[in-house]
């Protein structure tokens, strides 16, 4: 059981997540129908997170604050397309929330995701439901609601991924472009 996450583990989590995104970028590209079906969402998000990871790897410290700042800077500087900019804002909100912490509990992770969601929504002039914004908002709401019940960070993250998948499944009901295309979306 992992009750809290230190900087070293946080770094490993982001690197693993970036690898997972890279390995699935083609699938995500196929989900892309909004705002235009140009099929580049996975590629743009992958390039954005790769820039964040490149910056992360320049940090010698395992300080959560330093890691968060590096991820935020790298993702913003390397943001590609709408989805990349939104991802960079999610990371920015997460980084701001974890600043000053030595360890991250389940509740800290939930609050960080909520901060990421809120930051991303504020960055978009006209947020549209049925997009990546919806998935991160619904996931963060679930995280905050359930964070007091969970103690194991791994179990909590697994529940969170499951909830994000459910949210993604609901996106066609929220966005006309998706209903017309009969698909799921991430942007």
Could you say what each language-model-derived stretch is?
Residues 1-185:
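N-terminal loops that bind phosphate or other acidic moieties
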